């Protein structure tokens, strides 16, 4: 699923407030007792993620970038509420003027990229120009070109191909000024996403960087730098030699580096982790309960943490099968076997769910809107199968994803699709997002798709996942290609609301859109599960709630 960071729930629910700490607190209370050095070895199934900071938009990529990026403001390497407060990093302060439409950041001296070049205000202007660039097609563009949300002056024109310089971003000395078309209380939550980190001009403006052969190929200004990226094989991080403690640079840095191996066999990698040959590895569903029984939960080697994510089956409303076919989309929602689907992931994985907002989304309602009812599903579907053919994209890596795809295929057959008319297309790891994100793909449905919140506001769910005008040629996240004028207007109107009314309207729209439009079938909520070697020092495990994973700079080996 996409990484999706989420901020403290205290942020944005009032429509105006923002938690910003005035100074960087000490990152880890026990960090002084932790061993320095060592390479953290992690293995995973599936294909590798994208690594270009203006392109990468999946969970593992943002976890890595939390270790490599330097941002205007950032989140401390702390768990709980303390980790959800924005603190100054490269910017020492900012001021808001012109009725909330002008943000001026003061950039510190002392930050350097891993290739030795100084980080300046222009490093952030370049990041914004890359995000907005039409040819690069960054998924981050939606966060700065939104007429109902954050809209940087000139960003939409650049994104439409009219030039390469975002006119609303100005640099004068150590001052970075960003002008918005209108005031937006969510701006700081968005400009601190990894898309907008300090970016080296070594990265080409118009095309993606994917291969890294040394520390100079993808310079970064955080505690670590990516020194190698062999696509689908190995991604390596090592300490940034030019990152030294100082103002804004108070983060921990215990490990010498991290090596992430891709495309491993799930059971083999689990066995390697159990034998302490890997420090972190995959956890097959069949092994979860045994590991929990042997090591306990959240004590030594097995850990589980909830995440603000929802799993679903998008139905492509732009392709023939589900286009103008509400009855069939509703039928799928009644036909799927959610409990069996979730069970394929094993214990501690999450629970069945039926609407978009999970319990971590402000405005969510504790209700079940679809229950398994095959008779009703068949009644709704009757006469709406069109040519009877359906193409389903699914994740082929690991054991859980193919098992879930098999459950969905059985559900489709029970609904009335014949076996020989169901085409299953497998994709390794995050490759499924690239395939489904291209407008015009041949998928009618996707399996094992998921969404995790960027920040705790319902806008980040309905308006990002389902707002039609945001659809572009590639890197889409509206995998349903849902573009309905009536619902577009409702989403745009809801985006203008604040406070309790905003949450009430969005909470009802979540239920309404699932019942009356059904562009997807919701399957589940999620927990993260982790299995470690006995080399891992649990005192260094800091679960960063924003990135919903362990902080790499805080991690340590015994």
Show the residue positions of the predicted features.
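Alpha-helical secondary-structure segments
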Residues: 41, 119-129, 173-179, 183, ...
């Amino acid at each position: 699923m996409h990484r999706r960071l989420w901020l403290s729930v205290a942020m944005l629910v009032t429509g105006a407030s923002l938690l910003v700490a005035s100074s960087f607190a000490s990152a880890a209370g026990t960090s002084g007792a932790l061993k320095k050095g060592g390479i953290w070895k992690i293995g995973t199934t599936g294909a590798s993620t994208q690594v270009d900071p203006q392109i990468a938009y999946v969970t593992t990529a943002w976890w890595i970038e939390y270790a490599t990026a330097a941002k205007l403001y950032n989140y401390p390497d702390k768990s709980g509420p303390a980790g959800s407060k924005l603190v100054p990093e490269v910017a020492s302060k900012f001021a808001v003027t012109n009725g909330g439409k002008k943000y001026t950041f003061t950039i510190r001296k002392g930050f350097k990229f891993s290739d030795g070049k100084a980080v300046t205000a222009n490093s952030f202007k370049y990041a914004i120009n890359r995000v907005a660039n039409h040819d690069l097609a960054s998924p981050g563009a939606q966060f700065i070109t939104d007429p109902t949300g954050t809209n940087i002056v000139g960003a939409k024109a650049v994104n439409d191909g009219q030039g390469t310089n975002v006119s609303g971003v100005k640099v004068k000395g150590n001052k970075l000024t960003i002008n918005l078309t209108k005031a937006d209380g969510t701006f700081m939550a968005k400009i601190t996403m990894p898309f907008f980190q300090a970016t080296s001009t070594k990265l080409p403006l118009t095309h993606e960087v994917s291969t890294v052969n040394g520390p100079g190929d993808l310079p970064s200004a955080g505690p670590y730098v990516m020194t190698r990226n062999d696509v689908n094989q190995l991604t390596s991080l090592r300490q940034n030699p030019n990152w030294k403690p100082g103002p804004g640079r108070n983060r921990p840095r215990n490990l010498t580096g991290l090596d992430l191996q891709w495309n491993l066999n799930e059971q083999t990698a689990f066995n390697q982790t159990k034998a302490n040959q890997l420090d972190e590895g995959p956890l097959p569903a069949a092994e979860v309960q045994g590991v929990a029984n042997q090591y306990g939960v959240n004590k030594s080697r097995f850990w589980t943490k909830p995440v603000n994510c929802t799993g679903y089956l998008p139905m492509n409303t732009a392709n023939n099968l589900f286009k103008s076919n509400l009855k069939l989309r509703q039928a799928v929602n009644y036909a799927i076997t959610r409990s069996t689907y979730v069970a394929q992931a094993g214990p501690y994985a999450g629970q069945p769910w039926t609407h978009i907002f999970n319990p971590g989304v402000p405005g969510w309602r504790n209700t079940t809107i679809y229950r398994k009812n095959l008779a009703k599903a068949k009644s709704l579907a009757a006469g709406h199968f069109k040519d009877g053919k359906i193409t389903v994209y699914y994740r082929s890596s690991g054991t859980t994803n193919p098992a879930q795809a098999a459950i969905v295929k059985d559900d489709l057959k029970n609904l009335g699709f014949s076996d020989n008319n169901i085409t299953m297309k497998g994709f390794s790891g995050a490759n499924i997002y690239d395939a489904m994100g291209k407008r015009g793909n041949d998928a009618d449905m996707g399996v094992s798709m998921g969404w995790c919140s960027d920040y705790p506001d319902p806008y980040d769910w309905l308006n990002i996942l389902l707002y039609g005008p945001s659809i572009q040629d590639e890197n889409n996240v509206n995998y349903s290609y849902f573009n309905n004028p009536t619902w577009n207007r409702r989403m745009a109107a809801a985006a203008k609301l604040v406070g309790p009314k905003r949450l009430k309207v969005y909470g009802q729209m979540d239920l309404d859109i699932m019942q009356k439009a059904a562009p997807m079938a919701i399957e589940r909520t999620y927990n993260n599960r982790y299995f470690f070697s006995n080399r891992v020092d649990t005192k260094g495990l800091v679960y960063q709630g924003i990135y919903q994973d362990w902080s790499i700079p805080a991690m340590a080996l015994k």
